[in-house]
Structures are given as C-alpha cells and as structure tokens.
C-alpha cells in the first residue's frame, strides 16, 4: 500500500457486476490524470506532460466512451472481481492463463481483466516511447491513466460493486461520481495535499503485481465504504457519504495520481529516456486506442488497416463501469 515519502505501490479497486456508471466519472478521472502531470519530477518528461496536460485530463474519460461506441469487449478491462466466488484477494490467480484455468473462460472474463490490461497498456506506452511517436505516447498515457484510476476506485475490485448484496444499491455511482461532483474543490485540494506528501518513483516490481497490490487495497476500501454508508436514499445522501467516506476517496485519488506518474516515469526510463518533442498535434475525437499486445486477453489480435471491420461482438460482461 502507499506510504508517505516512500515509493508508491498502487492500491486499486476493481468491481464486478452491472453498474450504469463511469469509474470516478469525468471529474475524478480528469483530476487523477491532471494531478499526475503536476506530480512528475522536474525534467523533460514533466515538461512534455505539462505541455499536453489539458488533453490528458480532458480525454481521461475516453476509454469509457470508447467501450460504449467502439468495442463490446472493452468492458471487463476496467475492473476485477478480486473476491470472486469467495476467493481471498491474495489467492486470486496472478496470471490470465491461471485465472481461466481456475474459473473457465466465460467466468474469468466476467470477473474482469484490469491488472493485465494495466500491464498491457504500460507495455504499449514503453513501445510508444521507444518509437518516439508523440501522438501514441500522449494517447496511451491517457488510457493508462484511466485504467490506473479504475484500479484505485474501491468498487472496481469487488463483486458487491454496487451494494446490491447489502441493500445499498447505487453506492457505486454515488461514491465515484455524485459525491465527487458535489465536493470537487474540497476533494481536489485534499487529494493534492496528500499526493505531494508521497513519492513518485520508478516502479521496480512487475507491473501486474503492482496492479494487484492496488486492487487488494481497493477491495479493503470498498468494504469500509459500505460499512460507513448509512444506506439512506435522501437527496442529501451525497453530503452524508462525503462526511463518512470523503477521506477514502481523497486518499485513493491521491494514490492513483502518484501511481500513474510513477508508471509514466517507469515507462520512459525503460524506453531509454528518449528525447520528447516540445509540441504534439493530437487528433480530434476519442484518444486513439493503445495497441493490444496479448491477443488472448484482448479478445483478438489488433485489426490490420486493410481488414474489414469484424462483426460487433456481444458484451462479455453485464457490467457497465
């Protein structure tokens, strides 16, 4: 878990089920991506991201929009039911192959793919840095920010992702969107203060293992939020929830921003610290999707430019978060 003035270990939250919500919503995802740019250590990498900060923040929500309009198999890449089937988080298989062997392909897919998606996207960012492709770097870094943010959202790491199992239905979007929208300034101020007391540093562990650390912590935080939620459905519930759990949201957002900045820094270092351009002309519309490296995990190899668009697949999960 994240410790102050020490290299960050991401703590994440992955959830499984059907939830009509965007993880952290636009407010939270933009906050995390923007803050990560500010937290990078002084140097060429920070200069590059500060020059593209508005794009990285504004397009932080793009992966959610993308999964609704472009790829039906994108949904499970945004969460992980780390407690699926009563599994203890520390006992959940750490490889996709092991997960499929334990649960079967259908169940494994419905339970989510987030930690491997983070690793896959991180590898794509390293490749983009090596290619010195500025557009790919900015776009892939933006997508990575979304996935890292998802991992730190407590209700993206547990099966009771919307409180249905405990009579608290609606808690997911209330925690990640409504509460943030109603208390944006306070949460941003507190999260930034926390983040500045943490250390952005090269991640020296395996990125998948790093993501699992985040998810394990997120699962714990989900149970804490559920315990503190009074379950009332009054119009003032956002205020009550903020008073009870606002500190958890602030901490997770701070940790997500530090984790993201650390992963950006690590990708740049692993690529050999290439020189970066002063300006980048990004395309309009949704940020370009990163290259998917693992065909089995991704639901198929990337489509070649001259291939016809395949017939749209049915969603692999009933979750919409």
Label every model-predicted segment.
Residues 1-9:
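Bacterial N-terminal signal peptides that target proteins for export
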Residues 20-143, 154-254, 258-321:
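N-terminal, motif-rich segments that launch catalysis or mediate targeting to/interaction with membranes
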Residues 10-18:
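Bacterial N-terminal signal peptides
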Residues 14-15, 148, 168:
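Preference for short coil/turn "hinge" residues that link or interrupt alpha-helices
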Residues 11, 149, 236-239:
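Short linear motifs at secondary-structure transitions and domain/linker junctions
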Residues 143-149:
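Functional cores that coordinate and move charged inorganic groups
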């Amino acid at each position: 878990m994240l410790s102050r003035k020490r290299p960050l270990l991401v703590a994440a939250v992955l959830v499984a089920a059907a939830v009509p919500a965007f993880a952290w919503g636009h407010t939270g995802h933009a906050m995390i991506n923007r803050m990560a740019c500010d937290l990078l250590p002084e140097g060429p990498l920070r200069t590059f991201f500060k020059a593209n900060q508005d794009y990285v923040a504004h397009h932080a929500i793009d992966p959610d929009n993308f999964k609704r309009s472009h790829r039906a198999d994108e949904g499970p890449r945004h969460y992980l039911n780390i407690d699926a089937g009563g599994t203890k988080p520390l006992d959940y298989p750490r490889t996709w192959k092991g997960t499929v062997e334990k649960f079967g392909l259908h169940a494994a897919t419905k339970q989510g793919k987030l930690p491997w998606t983070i690793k896959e996207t991180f590898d794509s960012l390293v490749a983009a840095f090596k290619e010195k492709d500025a557009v790919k770097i900015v776009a892939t870094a933006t997508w990575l920010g979304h996935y890292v943010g998802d991992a730190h959202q407590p209700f993206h790491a547990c099966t009771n992702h919307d409180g249905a199992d405990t009579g608290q239905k609606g808690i997911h979007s209330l925690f990640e969107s409504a509460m943030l929208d109603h208390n944006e300034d306070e949460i941003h101020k507190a999260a930034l203060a926390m983040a500045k007391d943490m250390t952005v540093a090269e991640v020296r562990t395996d990125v998948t293992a790093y993501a699992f650390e985040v998810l394990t912590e997120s699962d714990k935080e989900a149970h804490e939020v559920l315990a503190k939620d009074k379950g009332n459905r009054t119009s003032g519930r956002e205020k009550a929830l903020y008073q009870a759990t606002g500190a958890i949201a602030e901490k997770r957002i701070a940790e997500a921003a530090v984790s993201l900045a650390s992963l950006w820094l690590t990708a740049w270092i692993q690529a050999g610290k290439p020189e970066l351009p002063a300006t980048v002309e990004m395309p309009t519309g949704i940020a370009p999707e990163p290259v998917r490296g693992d065909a089995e995990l991704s639901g198929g190899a990337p489509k070649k430019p001259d291939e016809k668009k395949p017939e749209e697949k049915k969603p692999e999960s009933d979750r919409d978060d």
